[in-house]
Amino acid sequence: MVLKAVCVLRGAGETTGTVYFEQEGNANAVGKGIILKGLTPGEHGFHVHGFGDNTNGCISAGPHFNPASKKHAGPKDEDRHVGDLGNVTADANGVAKIDITDKISLTGPYSIIGRTMVIHEKADDLGRGGNEESLKTGNAGSRLACGVIGTE
């Protein structure tokens, strides 16, 4: 059985996006056809945050989804937040188009359903910034756009 989810990201500014997820059986979830627009060219941190709450804008989403109480790191690191998806890269027109496969899940205790995806202002330093904030947020800056992940 293939599970599907979708997230529509919006913010106070021009940044918008759509992420479609699929997961077959117990395999890792796949983000397909991710399109983010209205970004400055370059890298931007991309994370799943813990709460599905956007009542006060993206800040209500809380910290990165981290059910195992790990430190912030990059998507290729074994020891990291579940929500650490690394960076997306926007082209000269401010558009990022990517597909990702990650250790995230659409079922079980580490499910991302009902949580919030956030695109950040700056690049994520993947926990290698040499300060305490790097180990929490990757120094990725303000939250440009966000949306709650729901079943499709």
Swiss-Prot record:
Location(s) in or outside the cell: Cytoplasm; Nucleus
Cysteines engaged in disulfide bonds, as pairs: 58-146
Cofactor details (free text): Binds 1 copper ion per subunit.
Enzyme Commission number(s) from the entry: 1.15.1.1
Main location, first listed in the record: cytoplasm
Family recorded in the similarity comment: Belongs to the Cu-Zn superoxide dismutase family.
Protein name: Superoxide dismutase [Cu-Zn]
Species of origin: Xiphias gladius
